[in-house]
UniProtKB/Swiss-Prot annotation:
Component of the molecular motor that translocates viral genomic DNA in empty capsid during DNA packaging. Forms a tripartite terminase complex together with TRM2 and TRM3 in the host cytoplasm. Once the complex reaches the host nucleus, it interacts with the capsid portal vertex. This portal forms a ring in which genomic DNA is translocated into the capsid. TRM1 carries an endonuclease activity that plays an important role for the cleavage of concatemeric viral DNA into unit length genomes. The lineage of its organism: Viruses, Duplodnaviria, Heunggongvirae, Peploviricota, Herviviricetes. Pfam families: PRTP. It comes from Human herpesvirus 1 (strain F) (HHV-1). Transmembrane segments: none annotated. Residues 41-66, 428-447, 452-483 are annotated as: Disordered. The keyword Repeat does not apply. Associates with TRM2 and TRM3 to form the tripartite terminase complex. Interacts with portal protein. This is Tripartite terminase subunit 1. Keywords: ATP-binding, Host nucleus, Late protein, Metal-binding, Nucleotide-binding, Viral genome packaging, Viral release from host cell. Its main location: host cell. Belongs to the herpesviridae TRM1 protein family.
Length: 780
């Protein structure tokens, strides 16, 4: 019997099913925006009740970044929420445009409204972030702008008040149009030269050949968010999908199947060019010699050389393509769009008796007036992005390989033809030699075969057919004529070797350039698909701010709430605890552990590698946090040594005044405020460490507000400890007692404070009855 499926799994499956349905609805909206408005008007519009229910569903998704009642967000819930709001908003706009078209009847006006041609670019969103160090203004224009802002907010979360969550609402508004429009990323939103956090994490685990992360980061191209996909079109799509189209009669369907691209083979495909016969007389002569030979005859080296050269010429696909064939192939590719349009019109006439006025047809004159680059980016109905990329690369190669040197290297059959001609000439000159014996030019035949097999010609000019010099044969004394002949041969050989090396280097440079440009073309032309990186990043940061508000709301309903912020007599407790702790210093053996605690508290909610199944230390998560925002090296060094620099000795670590812990009055600027927050957090860590050491009450846990995750019942458990809220109004919350299940309820005891030492004294008062010695004396 199979194990029962858990409730979270069932809920996730239902959300995925709903997400698929909403994605389909959004896709239909995008199609109707581009289709003939008569088609949209042909269907009955939704009733007012249906439209009201859609508005209610969208309104329920507008509870803000934290969701309804601060619900815990997931990438799936964020994506579904964005899709619902986009579907409702664009659906209402489309219905309004269809109603306007029913009155005016202007197709151009309909497409201008639905496609937003008269509206400004919707992908510009101003964002304002209020921090304790000042106000930051930014503009979101691209997807990487959203991710960068979320990572920066994650880094600055400890100096951002709870109202900083309002900035996430502006981010969400941008994501509704950018991510909620479906799986396909609008081309104007994606910039592959800005990698995401996942790309950086992958970069950190790959070999870098000694390069710094900053240097390697500049060469990374984004492949995860968004990711690029191959897509194509086949002329058999109509034949495959038309039989399943609803609302059509069998006669109309059969008539449509007899026309269009489904009526025959792909006429837009490339036609293989027939092999081109060159040097027919040489090949015929060689074939005649080979046909006259049989196994009962002795094989001469020259005949064997001819056979070997014919083998090299016959092996492989070396069929050339004439200029006219290439021109005809290009014309066929250019005509593919026209053929597709003609076939589509034929199918429409067969099915509906009229030619539909879609967006690309209504604005055909505008599309035809675009320049080559814009037309390349827009693409076509019958040409996939990969077809465009291959055509551009093929045209580039065809242009550059017209150079004789490159053509000779990439067309080795020319070398084989020349070698075959030389062998035949030598055999004709030595025809009077003894049959079956080795003629005087056997070495020359062997050299010719080797040159032909290697594709090595003599591009330097004439002289290739000359016999080896007497010095090369090692016969006879040298004469001035022999020396001149040898010098000329050496010049030709050096020229050949230089040309060969130059050709190979040029071809390698061309290949390297084409590979780089191919990558750029893939970035520009291939279809990009949204991943889960952006919704996951938004959910993590939003959950961090929602956790602050949730902790404040839950602790306010505890059974016992002690507010030291306005209680009398707290100053004496502050003086007593401060004086008792400053007399001690932290054990050096504890510095590594409290350093990791410091890294855990200053890190944001986005990078939580320390909570994974295969947990990593907190310094790893903080490393990803600071590297993704481009923190300068000197600040990273300062942050790494922040705890070690204090060491818990002396009074330098106690930086806050009474009831002014986490107070940033008089400090301006992000970096100075961030440094002040680090000092406050260091003070809290050292004070709690000394408190546990001096009073021997066990380790006092320091926790973040987002340390708790909802259970399957939606409840949050907060273990006892001191919670740093990052809110200057109430930065410290101590839960000294809670219910047995860990939830905050009537039995819980909570302490609010703005002072480290007074809240520690309150904790000591609560723990004193449990201590073996009853605790130390209180303040005088």
């Amino acid at each position: 019997m199979a194990a029962p499926v858990s409730e979270p799994t069932v809920a996730r499956q239902k959300l995925l099913a709903l997400l698929g349905q909403v994605q389909t609805y959004v896709f239909q909206i995008e199609l109707l925006r581009r289709c003939d408005p008569h088609i949209g008007r042909g269907n009955a519009p939704p009733t007012e009740a249906e439209r009201a229910s859609g508005a209610g569903a969208a309104a329920s998704s507008e509870a803000g970044p934290g969701g309804p009642a601060g619900a815990f967000l997931t990438p799936l819930s964020v994506t579904l929420e964005l899709l619902l709001e986009y579907a409702w908003r664009e659906g209402e706009r489309l219905l309004g445009s269809l109603e306007t078209f029913a009155t005016a009847g202007d197709v151009a006006v309909f497409f201008t409204e639905t496609m937003g041609l008269a509206r400004p670019c919707p992908y510009h969103q101003r964002v304002r972030l209020d921090t304790y160090g000042g106000t930051v203004h930014m503009e979101l224009c691209f997807l990487h702008d959203v991710e960068n802002f979320l990572k920066q907010l994650n880094y600055c979360h400890l100096i951002t008040p709870s109202r900083g969550a309002t900035a996430l609402e502006r981010v969400r508004e941008f994501m509704v149009g950018a991510v909620g429009s479906g799986l396909i990323v609008p081309p104007e939103l994606s910039d592959p030269s800005h990698p995401c956090a996942v790309c950086f994490e992958e970069l950190c685990v790959t070999a870098n050949q000694g390069a710094t992360i900053a240097a390697a980061w500049r060469t990374v191209s984004v492949t995860t968010s968004p990711s690029r996909r191959r897509c194509g079109w086949t002329p058999t799509s109509v034949r495959r999908y038309l039989p399943h189209a609803a609302g059509l009669s069998d006669a109309d369907r059969a008539g449509a199947l007899r026309v269009g691209p489904c009526a025959g083979p792909d006429r837009g495909g490339r036609r293989a060019a027939p092999p081109v016969a060159e040097n027919d007389s040489v090949r015929k002569e060689a074939d005649a010699l080979l046909e006259a030979h049989d196994v009962f005859q002795a094989t001469t080296p020259g005949l064997y050389a001819i056979s070997e050269l014919r083998f090299w010429l016959a092996s492989g696909d070396r069929a050339g393509q004439t200029t006219m064939d290439a021109f005809a192939s290009n014309l066929t590719a250019l005509a593919r769009e026209l053929q597709q349009e003609t076939a589509a019109v034929a199918v429409e006439l067969a099915l509906f008796g009229r030619r539909a006025e879609h967006f690309d047809r209504a604005f055909g004159s505008h599309l035809a007036a675009l320049d080559m680059v814009d037309a390349l980016i827009i693409g076509g109905q019958a040409t996939s992005p990969d077809d465009q990329i291959e055509a551009l690369i093929r045209a580039c190669y065809d242009h550059h390989l017209t150079t004789p040197l490159l053509r000779r290297l990439v067309s080795p059959e020319q070398c084989d033809e020349e070698a075959l001609r030389r062998v035949l000439a030598r055999m004709g000159a030595g025809a009077g030699g003894p049959k079956g014996g080795a003629g005087p030019d056997d070495d020359g035949d062997r050299v010719a075969v080797e040159e032909g097999a290697r594709g090595l010609g003599a591009p330097g000019g004439g002289g290739e057919d000359e016999a080896p010099s007497p010095r090369a044969r090692g016969t006879g004394p040298e004469t001035w004529g022999d020396i001149a002949t040898q010098a000329a041969a050496d010049v030709r050989e050096r020229r050949r070797l230089y040309a060969d090396r130059l050709t190979k280097r040029s071809l390698a440079s061309l290949g390297r350039c084409v590979r780089e440009q191919r990558g750029e073309l893939e970035k520009m032309l291939r279809v990009s698909v949204h991943g889960e990186v952006l919704p996951a990043t938004f959910a993590a940061v939003a959950n961090g701010f929602a956790a602050r508000a949730l902790l404040a709301a839950l602790t306010a309903g505890a059974g016992t709430v002690i507010d030291n912020r306005s209680a009398p007599g707290v100053f004496d407790a502050h003086r007593f605890m401060r004086a008792s702790l400053l007399r001690h210093q932290v054990d050096p053996a504890l510095l590594p552990s409290i350093t990791h605690r410091f890294f855990e508290l200053v890190n944001g909610p986005l990078f939580d590698h320390s909570t994974h199944s295969f947990a990593q230390p907190p310094n790893t998560a903080l490393y990803y946090s600071v590297e993704n925002v481009g923190l300068l090296p000197h600040l990273k060094e300062e942050l790494a040594r922040f705890i070690m620099g204090a060491g818990g000795s002396g009074a330098d670590w106690a930086v806050s005044e009474f009831q002014r812990f986490y107070c940033f009055d008089g400090i301006s600027g992000i970096t100075p405020t961030q440094r002040a927050a680090w000092r406050y957090i260091r003070e809290l860590i050292i004070a709690t460490t000394l408190f546990a050491s001096v009073y021997r009450c066990g380790e006092l846990e320091l926790r973040r507000p987002d340390c708790s995750r909802p259970t399957s019942e939606g409840r949050y458990r907060y273990p006892p400890g001191v919670y740093l809220t990052y809110d200057s109004d109430c930065p410290l919350v101590a839960i000294v007692e809670s219910a047995p299940d860990g939830c905050i309820g009537p039995r819980s005891v909570v302490v609010y404070d703005r002072d480290v030492f007074s809240i520690l004294y309150s904790v000591l008062q609560h723990l004193a009855p449990r201590l073996p010695d009853g605790g130390h004396d209180g303040p005088p």
